[in-house]
């Protein structure tokens, strides 16, 4: 067992193989340490998020080392049967690759239960494994398909999996099931969770069904008839989303946190209008939005440095300040121009934006496509009951935000895979400035510089958990800086992660700006005794 640094609130446990990883994950899950916030199991690692205000990394490691997971842990196993029509387009090719008949491939797939090792790639996509590895390692397609139908049963490497929704993919398709791997109308949307036992049933020549127990329908948590519309969207801008603090305790289903990118600006907007800190608000990308006021309300705009305008019913335009409480009357209009610095504004409405929650949050996840859809023209913004205190007249705006062409310094914590890179490349990582490209979004910032980073370990990295702020290095050597909507697991080594105190700053870096990375001095020394 090896412990690797990830960030001030997270660490990576590296184990020898999948079997030991699953044993330890089940044990830690059942032990339920009060200061462990979340765990992301993967092929040979467990990413552990903890509360650094309650426990140090060293104390947590000491506790984990003292645990003695049992090899025969069977607690809370669910047994699920999934019926499959084995008519996938790649089935003959897989049989040829393995020097088997099609019948033999099917027989091997159904002859013993598979176990859900971890959830990754997409919500509800379980990586299923068997100790006997019945197919060895099945190669992925040379050219991934642009669209794979939901319910497709597939093989890749030592795993089998079922696509939960229509999506691109490079796995070999051997069959199809009609069961829903991901269904938000169920109490537990993900059909499969880590450590579940799955048995495939061949129903190629008869109708399919799926055995799922304890399925319940959810009910909406917002009664539309009780809501008060206060704003109407006249211009929706490039991307305007409802966001709050994000989702918690859903990583086991393959779902990320999402949530407001610049938490500081989001919290201040709510504070100014007297809301709870976690009240839902609007996140506006690159300005260009306009709203019509339908009922008396108080709002605040924070985040990027933008011109903000109030146009009254007589068409009189008044420029107003950000980080200030704004009392608006019916027929007024509120306009936020594209920013001069930064990239995201936050618009809080007294009472909070009211909308149905999905998996405990009002946030929209752009990768998983979960939560309230991006706002469009004529959408109505309704308020809830999140106001708990008096309105504050104003709050202090943050330090100067980055502009295109400028350089901003960002602290990083090295790890967990720093040793996979040549020492010269690590020096180059800190020496050169990295430009944020226009191929950047809530999933991640794509960076570029003249000299890509080179690896000294060339082997393929098994998928492992990644944190927000992780700097993953693909084969071209140009980093991808993962943000709030990033996939929970990744297959490229992570050189470093943005220190938690600089994540808000990163959320406001526009395309065309440059990042100068600095090594954060408080690196976790997990090897010290």
Q: What are the functions of these language-model segments?
A:
Residues 1-529:
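Conserved "landmark" site that anchors the functional core of diverse proteins
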């Amino acid at each position: 067992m090896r412990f690797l640094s990830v960030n001030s609130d997270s660490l990576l446990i590296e184990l020898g193989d999948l079997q030991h990883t699953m044993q330890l994950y089940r044990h830690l899950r059942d032990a339920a340490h009060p200061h462990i916030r979340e765990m992301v199991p993967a092929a040979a690692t467990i990413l552990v998020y903890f509360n650094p205000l309650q426990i140090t990394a060293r104390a947590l490691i000491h506790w984990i080392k003292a645990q003695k997971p049992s090899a025969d842990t069977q607690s809370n196993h669910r047994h699920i049967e999934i019926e499959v029509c084995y008519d996938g387009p790649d089935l003959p090719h897989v049989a040829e690759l393995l020097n088997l008949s099609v019948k033999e491939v099917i027989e091997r797939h159904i002859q013993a239960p598979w176990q859900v090792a971890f959830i990754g790639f997409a919500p509800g996509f379980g990586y299923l494994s068997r100790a006997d590895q019945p197919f060895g390692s099945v190669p992925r397609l040379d050219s991934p398909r642009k669209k794979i139908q939901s319910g497709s049963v597939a093989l890749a490497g030592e795993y089998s999996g079922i696509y939960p929704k229509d999506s691109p993919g490079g796995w070999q398709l051997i069959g199809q099931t009609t069961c829903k791997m991901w269904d938000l109308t169920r109490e537990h949307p993900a059909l499969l969770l880590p450590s579940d036992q799955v048995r495939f049933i061949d129903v190629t020549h008869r109708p399919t069904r799926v055995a799922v127990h304890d399925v319940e329908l959810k009910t909406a948590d917002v009664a539309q008839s009780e809501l008060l519309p206060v704003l109407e969207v006249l211009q929706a801008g490039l991307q305007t989303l409802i966001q709050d603090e994000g989702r918690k305790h859903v990583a086991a289903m393959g779902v990320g946190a999402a949530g407001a990118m610049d938490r500081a600006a989001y919290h201040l907007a709510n504070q100014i209008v007297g809301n709870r800190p976690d009240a839902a608000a609007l996140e506006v990308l690159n300005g260009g939005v306009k709203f019509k006021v339908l009922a008396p309300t108080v709002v605040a705009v924070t985040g990027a440095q933008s011109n903000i305008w109030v146009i009254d019913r007589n068409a009189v335009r008044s420029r107003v300040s950000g980080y200030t409480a704004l009392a608006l009357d019916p027929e007024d209009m509120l306009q936020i121009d594209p920013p001069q610095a930064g990239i995201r504004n936050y618009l809080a409405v007294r009472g909070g934006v009211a909308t149905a929650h999905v998996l405990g949050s009002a946030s929209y996840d752009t990768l998983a496509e979960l939560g309230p859809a991006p706002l469009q023209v004529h959408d109505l913004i309704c308020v809830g009951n999140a106001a708990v205190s008096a309105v504050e007249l104003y709050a202090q705006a943050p330090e100067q935000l980055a502009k295109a062409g400028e350089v901003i310094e960002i602290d990083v914590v090295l790890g967990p895979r720093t040793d996979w890179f040549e020492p010269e490349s690590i020096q180059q990582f800190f020496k050169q400035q990295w430009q944020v490209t226009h191929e950047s979004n809530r999933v991640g910032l794509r960076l570029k510089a003249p000299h890509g980073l080179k690896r000294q370990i060339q082997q393929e990295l098994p998928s492992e958990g990644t944190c927000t702020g992780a700097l993953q290095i693909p084969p071209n050597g140009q980093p991808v800086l993962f943000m709030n909507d990033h996939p929970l697991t990744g297959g490229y080594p992570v050189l470093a992660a943005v220190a938690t105190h600089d994540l808000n700053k990163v959320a406001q870096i526009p395309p065309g700006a440059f990042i100068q990375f600095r090594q954060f001095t408080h690196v976790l020394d997990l090897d010290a005794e």
